[in-house]
Amino acid sequence: MPEDRKAAAKVEPLRKTRPCPECGKPSNREHYPFCSNRCREVDLSRWLTGSYAIPVAEDETKADYPDEEN
């Protein structure tokens, strides 16, 4: 096998195992970043029902901006 052919075949490393965002168990490659299909579906359900939301102020003049000083 020629040397230039070996250099072209680069293998990428797998992602690091991270804790599942739902239960904390090590993540599974098939369901990444979750550990199982159940945890993946629980997270999807929370997105679809609106459990994950960015809080907004009804009136912009009453909004708290932590970076600004009064």
UniProtKB/Swiss-Prot annotation:
Binds 1 zinc ion. Pfam families: YacG. Keywords: Metal-binding, Zinc. GO terms for molecular function: DNA topoisomerase type II (double strand cut, ATP-hydrolyzing) inhibitor activity; zinc ion binding. It comes from the Bacteria. GO terms for biological process: regulation of DNA-templated transcription. Zn(2+) binds at C20, C23, C35, C39. InterPro entries: DNA_gyrase_inhibitor_YacG, Znf_NHR/GATA. SUPFAM superfamilies: Glucocorticoid receptor-like (DNA-binding domain) (SSF57716). Its cofactor is Zn(2+). HAMAP family: DNA_gyrase_inhibitor_YacG. Interacts with GyrB. Belongs to the DNA gyrase inhibitor YacG family. Inhibits all the catalytic activities of DNA gyrase by preventing its interaction with DNA. Acts by binding directly to the C-terminal domain of GyrB, which probably disrupts DNA binding by the gyrase. This is DNA gyrase inhibitor YacG. It comes from Rhizobium etli (strain CIAT 652).
